[in-house]
Amino acid sequence: MAQFAYTPQAWATLIQTPQDRAAASDTLLRHFGGRLIGLYYTPGAEYDGFALFEAPSDATAAAVEIADIALGHLRSNRLLRVLSAEEMRAALQQAAAAPNIAPKAAG
């Protein structure tokens, strides 16, 4: 998932020429072997919106974000790794097997 915030100039362009940014995002993702699941806007929040997408790898997701940022229409951006419920359950099971390395009390 990527959270994004547009520059003031990007907003001005979108107001003057409303356009489907989901299609543009999907085009970029498909170039890298990914796909857009959804593009959502969050007016009034820290970020203007977020894109939920799939990419072949974490490195590819980073490449998509770098390519998007380089276009100059984003003021800020944050890439987040989203886990499914199944992935989270597997992570919890792995964590349960971790050794206890907590500091020990004197005594």
Per-region residue spans from a language model:
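An amphipathic, aromatic/His-enriched active-site/gating alpha helix that lines ligand/cofactor pockets
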Residues: 54-86
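Short S/T/G/P-rich N-terminal loop/turn motif that feeds into the first structured element of a domain
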Residues: 1-31, 35-37, 41-47, 85-107
